[in-house]
């Protein structure tokens, strides 16, 4: 189990990403727009840099929702590989069976 502080940190990052997503997209659109003046694009770049670092989606880390494990996480389920296997073996995930060939 990951430390609670790490899980809370990731939750805080997720909240910040959600909060600043619109503002960030707006500023990026101005920066990418070639028809805008160079000065206006520069101002948008400065405003983008002034946003909190943790509001960038690249700083998020996928973690298991049950254990907080940062590696081996399946995005589709939001679970780590270990917990995914345990739950699948109990038959709690519809349609998921152990592979055999």
From Swiss-Prot:
Membrane-spanning ranges: none
Query: What Pfam families does the record tag this protein with?
Result: Ribosomal_S14
Gene Ontology terms, MF aspect:
rRNA binding; structural constituent of ribosome
- SUPFAM superfamilies named among the record's database cross-references: Glucocorticoid receptor-like (DNA-binding domain)
Q: Which InterPro entries match?
A: Ribosomal_uS14, Ribosomal_uS14_bac/plastid
Q: Which GO terms describe its biological process?
A: translation
- Has keyword Electron transport? no
Keywords of the record: Ribonucleoprotein, Ribosomal protein, RNA-binding, rRNA-binding
Identify one Gene Ontology CC term for this UniProt entry: small ribosomal subunit
**Function field:** Binds 16S rRNA, required for the assembly of 30S particles and may also be responsible for determining the conformation of the 16S rRNA at the A site.
Q: Whom does it interact with, and what assembly results?
A: Part of the 30S ribosomal subunit. Contacts proteins S3 and S10.
Name the family the entry cites. Answer: Belongs to the universal ribosomal protein uS14 family.
Name under which the protein is recorded:
Small ribosomal subunit protein uS14
